[in-house]
Amino acid sequence: VTPPGSDFELGTDGPTLILVGIDGSRTSWRAAAYAAGLARRQHCRLLAVYVARLSANIGAAPGVAAAMSEAAAQAAGEIEQRMRDGAAEMGLDFEFRAVMGDPWTELNRAAKELKADAVVVGASEHAGHRIVGSLATRLVRAGKWPVTVVP
């Protein structure tokens, strides 16, 4: 039941798009596997978003920005190929996006733009995130879609 004037329900009957954030970490690969299974069972599209973080040291020395950009492009290419191979094996409608920026901002932007029905991310492996707040916590607080955090 939807309360009058509520705009919470965004989608259609059944999901049409599952978004997974992937950065190459162990937990992000587990999140990708979970999201792929979910997309297969729900017969919907899977969008994987790789976000290369911008470093505060990007302008510290000549060539640093180019080297970082090249490394991010190489990592994104390897992740995309592995994801495409897995999606093809599962018969999934799959899309991949690689962007540079803040992971929360970029995942939030992609989810809004494409009207994702759910967002799946891996649990943070960084101890400092327990104090500052993890990407998953920030996505949950955005409150726009269901967020699944895979350990």
Which ranges hold each PLM region?
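Small/aliphatic-rich secondary-structure junction motif
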Residues: 7-63, 88, 142
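A short acidic, glycine-rich active-site loop
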Residues: 65-78
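Short, hinge-like loop/turn segments at secondary-structure boundaries
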Residues: 63-67, 113-115, 137-138
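Structural beta-alpha unit
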Residues: 1-14, 85-119, 126
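Glycine-rich, Arg-bearing micro-motifs that act as flexible, cationic patches
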Residues: 118-142
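Short, acidic/small-residue loops that bind anionic groups at enzyme active sites
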Residues: 142-151
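General small-molecule cofactor/ligand-binding pocket signal
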Residues: 47-49, 95-99, 148
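Short glycine/serine/threonine/alanine-rich loop segments
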Residues: 42-45, 92, 116, 145
